[in-house]
Design a protein with these regions (language model features):
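Hydrophobic core segments of alpha-helical transmembrane domains in multi-pass membrane transport
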Residues: 1-2, 20-26, 53-61, 97-106, ...
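Membrane-interface helix caps of multi-pass small-molecule transporters
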Residues: 3, 7, 28, 32-37, ...
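Alpha-helical transmembrane segments within multi-pass membrane transporters and channels
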Residues: 9-53, 60, 192-197, 228
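Transmembrane alpha-helical segments in multi-pass inner-membrane proteins
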Residues: 9-21, 143-150, 154-219
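Residues that define the loop-to-transmembrane-helix transition and helix capping
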Residues: 13-14, 45, 126, 136-137, ...
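Short amphipathic alpha-helical coupling elements at transmembrane boundaries
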Residues: 35-40, 77-81, 117-130
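Transmembrane helix-bundle core of multi-pass membrane transporters
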Residues: 37-111, 138, 203, 208, ...
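Helix-loop-helix "hairpin" substructures at the membrane interface of multi-pass membrane proteins
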Residues: 86-164, 187-193
Length: 238
């Protein structure tokens, strides 16, 4: 997104769309070259491979653009006053975009045949294959959707933060916390887990100190796992 806006001079929304296409294609390539050969390996191998890809891509980005902090100019710099609540337009765009994408993904998985095949394969890959589902095609589609959504999320998030190669580390850690809190295999749980983390960080930063804002997610993780180790909305997926 930074490259397409700063170097190519594309419009903000065009840059996000281009980033979504590129990251989706890159995700499919990673699935074919890395994760597909590991489909029968122990689950830990996938995690190690994902970390390796992350470090490799960060190194490539740093080689071309350096490790300096950069900014993406937001086309929405207005400050909105909604019922006495002051809110930057870009942050409102992030909120609306997040709920819109979550709703679209939920409808896609629940109301379309393709979405149903993705859910079926997530629950039982071998069983899905036995009933005629093309597991390879569904896997590539799943990676493409995940990559595109990640690119759109990053494009919405980048204008309110500094952009640098390792900017995703903290986001990934919080995503891990959200998945654990919500329960593996539960999309509604992931949504509610994200809201819990978001509100907790906002309230903690306001009443305590913004210095400790990023620690709150991990404190919540320890507390909730101590009470309910399977997460709040687990679907029984192991």
């Amino acid at each position: 997104c930074y490259f397409t806006m700063s170097d190519l001079g594309l419009n903000y929304w065009v840059a996000i769309a281009a980033a979504a296409v590129v990251v989706a294609a890159l995700s499919v390539i990673c699935e074919r070259l890395v994760f597909h050969p590991l489909r029968h390996a122990p689950p830990i191998h996938d995690k190690i491979a994902a970390i390796g890809i992350l470090l490799f891509l960060e190194a490539v980005v740093q080689m071309y653009w350096g490790a300096d902090f950069r900014r993406i100019a937001s086309p929405y710099n207005q400050i909105l006053d909604i019922g006495g609540l002051t809110l930057p337009a870009q942050r409102l765009l992030i909120i609306v975009g997040a709920f819109s994408l979550m709703g679209a993904l939920h409808l896609y998985l629940k109301k379309t045949m393709t979405g149903a095949t993705i859910v079926a394969m997530a629950q039982n890959r071998e069983g899905a294959f036995l009933v005629g589902i093309d597991a390879n095609r569904v896997a590539m589609m799943t990676f493409a959707i995940a990559g595109a959504l990640a690119a759109v999320a990053a494009g919405l998030f980048a204008p309110i933060n500094l952009v640098y190669p390792a900017m995703g580390h903290l986001v990934l850690l919080k995503a891990f916390v959200i998945i654990i809190l919500g329960g593996m295999g539960s999309i509604p749980g992931a949504i509610i887990g994200g809201l819990i983390i978001g509100f907790s960080e906002a309230l903690g930063g306001f009443y305590l100190s913004s210095t400790y804002k990023d620690v709150i997610a991990f404190v919540l993780l320890v507390v909730i796992l101590s009470i309910k180790p399977t997460g709040l909305f687990t679907k029984g997926v192991r």
